[in-house]
From Swiss-Prot:
GO terms for biological process: viral life cycle. This is Virion infectivity factor. Keywords: Host cell membrane, Host cytoplasm, Host membrane, Host-virus interaction, Membrane, Phosphoprotein, Ubl conjugation, Ubl conjugation pathway, Virion. The lineage of its organism: Viruses, Riboviria, Pararnavirae, Artverviricota, Revtraviricetes. It holds the Pfam family Vif.
Length: 232
C-alpha cells in the first residue's frame, strides 16, 4: 500500500541557485574555521520531506534548533522545475511538538546570541584605549533592534562575563582605571577620549561574510537586493 502524501503549508523565500551556492560556501568556511557543530543533511537523508534538496541544523544550546530547508523543483505543474526556495523554522527541544516559522531577521538575531560575537579581542583593546567606533562582525543580527551597540559597551560585557580567556598584559591591566597618572597609556586614552569621533548606525560588512539568513533569503547583503517572502 502506498503512503498518502500530507501537504504542509510553509513560508519560503524564492531565491536563485547561485545565492544558495554562495551561502553554502560561506557555511562550510565557518564550520571548518570555528568547528561549528552545525549539521548538514542531503536530500536522501530526509526521505520524508518532499522537494527538500538539503537541510542545515543549527543548534541553539539549551532551547532548540534552527532548521534551514532548501527546496528545489517546486510546483512542476506551473513550470517551476528549476526554481529554488528557502524555509527557516525553529524546533523546540523542550516541547517536541512545538515548531514555528522564522523570518530571516529573527533567525539572524537568534544565531547571533550563540555564534559570531560582535567584537574581536583586538577591537576590545582599541576600545579600552579610547577609540570609539561602531562595528560588528554580524550586523544582520541587529536588524530587530535597529542599531549596533557601541564597542565600549560590548567590551565591558565581554570583560565582566569572562569572554576574554587570555592572560592580561601589563598595558591592558593599566587601562582598567584610566587616568592622567597612569603613564603613556593613560594619557593616550585620555587624549583619544576627548576627540569628536564619527558615529554611525550603519554597520560595515566584514571581509569574510557571515552565513546570514537574510543573505540566503535574498535580502540585504553584499548584493544589496531584496526579495519578498512567498508561500509556496
Amino acid at each position: 500500500m502506498s503512503q498518502e502524501k500530507h501537504w504542509v503549508m510553509r513560508l519560503t523565500w524564492k531565491v536563485q541557485e547561485e545565492v544558495i551556492t554562495k551561502w553554502q560556501g560561506i557555511v562550510r568556511y565557518w564550520m571548518n574555521k570555528r568547528n561549528l557543530k552545525w549539521e548538514y543533511k542531503m536530500h536522501y537523508q530526509i526521505t520524508w520531506a518532499w522537494y527538500t534538496m538539503s537541510r542545515y541544523v543549527i543548534p541553539l544550546p539549551g532551547s532548540g534548533e534552527i532548521h534551514v530547508d532548501i527546496y528545489w523543483h517546486l510546483a512542476p505543474k506551473q513550470g517551476w522545475l528549476s526554481t529554488y526556495a528557502v524555509g527557516i523554522q525553529y524546533v523546540s527541544l523542550v516541547n517536541d511538538k512545538y515548531r514555528t516559522e522564522l523570518d530571516p531577521n529573527t533567525a539572524d538575531s537568534m544565531i547571533h546570541c550563540h555564534y559570531f560575537t560582535c567584537f574581536t579581542d583586538r577591537a576590545i583593546q582599541q576600545a579600552l584605549r579610547g577609540n570609539r567606533f561602531i562595528f560588528c562582525q554580524f550586523p544582520g543580527g541587529h536588524k530587530l533592534t535597529g542599531q549596533v551597540p557601541s564597542l565600549q559597551y560590548l567590551a565591558l560585557l565581554a570583560h565582566q562575563n569572562g569572554l576574554r580567556k587570555r592572560s592580561q598584559r601589563g598595558e591592558t591591566r593599566r587601562t582598567r582605571n584610566l587616568g592622567s597618572q597612569q603613564g603613556a597609556v593613560g594619557r593616550m586614552a585620555q587624549r583619544y577620549g576627548r576627540r569628536n569621533q564619527q558615529r554611525s548606525q550603519t554597520a560595515f560588512w566584514p571581509r569574510t561574510p557571515i552565513p546570514s539568513m537574510e543573505l540566503l533569503s535574498g535580502g540585504r547583503g553584499e548584493t544589496g537586493k531584496t526579495h519578498s517572502g512567498k508561500g509556496i
